[in-house]
Amino acid sequence: MSATITATSATATATQKKPFYRILYVQVLAAIVLGVIVGWLWPDIGKNDWIKAMGDGFVKLIKMAIAPIIFCTVVSGIAHISEVKKVGRVAVKALVYFEVVSTFALALGLVVANVLRPGAGFQGQSNAAAVAGYAKQASEMKSVDFVLHIIPDTVVGAFAQGEILQVLLFAILFGFALMGLGERAHTVRSFVDDVAHAMFGVISIVVKVAPIGAFGAMAYTIGRYGPQALGNLAGLIATFYLTAFLFVVVGLGIIARIAGFSIFKFLKYIKDELLIVLGTSSSESALPQMMEKLEILGCSKSVVGLVVPTGYSFNLDGTNIYMTLATLFIAQAMNVDLSFGEQMTILVVAMLTSKGASGITGAGFITLAGTLAAVRPELLPGMAIVLGIDKFMSECRALTNLCGNGVACVVVAWWEGELDREKLRVALDRNVDPTDLEVAVTTG
């Protein structure tokens, strides 16, 4: 089998380059800046419900397509595999990678918090009542409930409610069922492939309004919380962003180098998705486009279909960093000394409470409450200290989660021998808009 890769639009792109104002990431970046200005100078306009609806509406438009895209991608990936062992092998390798990297992210948060001590000498006011709702939800998050929640009551309900893990479970079972039918399932496989292409077409239409969503989300955030919300806790925000930067550039950078690619070229390749996530504070808003780009990058459809959706529940690197860093910040702000043993307990508990958090509203804050409730309940009132700035840190959590899952997919594909090196080189090295890059594979 040989793969012939052709970048059919490379020449056209070079000679007829898009005007800069028509490039998506330029539009999104401009919308974010405009949103900050509107929210800062005219907060009453910024926090208007209609402005908020712009951001919420865009995220909902993306989310409406996530479940069918994941279902079709996973089913198609598994159904086209002739070897059952291969699916299990990919899943095991993905989970091993997730646990190792997640542990590193949690440990990095602990180390940075101990070295920089952003909560030491904190002077501020907290309102314990403000976090009562989050703490209540966290108390209901038990391991057995999480496992049972993966199994849907009905298949229709899983799709209707957008429960990613439930859809993923059904897709895996359905894919194996089609695999067992062999050639008799050819028509169904073709239908699933066609639906997947149609859904990606829907996303390509929806993503054109990303600048509107980014503007609305940013204008509302600044208008609602105000720039002064950043002032009092700038130390924690700066520490969190610094830690996430180190994790992506150094941690993921080393992993990427081992797998044979540059983290900087990879980040440039997914710049559109990063800006969409920055504007919406939701890593799920870029999931469909991310899956499509990873296939263009050379990852096999089966690896992309299994690793990326699973990573949104088991590989939340940004959330992991946030939980250990915020826990120590709260302890320092409340003058509570945590022993080494207690910090190791926090790491282990956070590893468990973070699983499946992506499907929960206010996931980072709720999992933080779950971790504190399990380790040091007396720290729960201190969550009110970070409540006001949690929104400003959610962007960084989402960006880090997206980067982590993208790198994870490429690494697992490389580990499994399912990474097309030539496609990887073409996609990362050519000065071509990735969305314009057509990759044709000819089997001979």
Curated annotation (Swiss-Prot):
Is this entry keyworded Acetylation? no
GO terms for biological process? L-aspartate transmembrane transport
Report the domain of life of the source organism. Bacteria
UniProt-recorded Gene Ontology molecular function terms: fumarate transmembrane transporter activity; malate:proton symporter activity; succinate transmembrane transporter activity
Q: Name one GO cellular component term.
A: plasma membrane
Q: Which residues form a coiled coil?
A: none
Q: Which Gene3D superfamilies match?
A: Sodium:dicarboxylate symporter
Compartments where found: Cell inner membrane
Is Transcription tagged as a keyword? no
* Keywords of this entry: Cell inner membrane, Cell membrane, Membrane, Symport, Transmembrane, Transmembrane helix, Transport
Q: How does it sit in the membrane?
A: Multi-pass membrane protein
The transmembrane segments are: 23-43, 61-81, 95-115, 162-182, 198-218, 236-256
Q: What does this protein do?
A: Responsible for the transport of dicarboxylates such as succinate, fumarate, and malate from the periplasm across the membrane.
Under PANTHER family, the record lists:
AEROBIC C4-DICARBOXYLATE TRANSPORT PROTEIN, PROTON/GLUTAMATE-ASPARTATE SYMPORTER
What family name appears in the similarity comment? Answer: Belongs to the dicarboxylate/amino acid:cation symporter (DAACS) (TC 2.A.23) family.
- The protein depicted here goes by the name C4-dicarboxylate transport protein 2
What organism does the UniProt record list as the source?
Bradyrhizobium diazoefficiens (strain JCM 10833 / BCRC 13528 / IAM 13628 / NBRC 14792 / USDA 110)
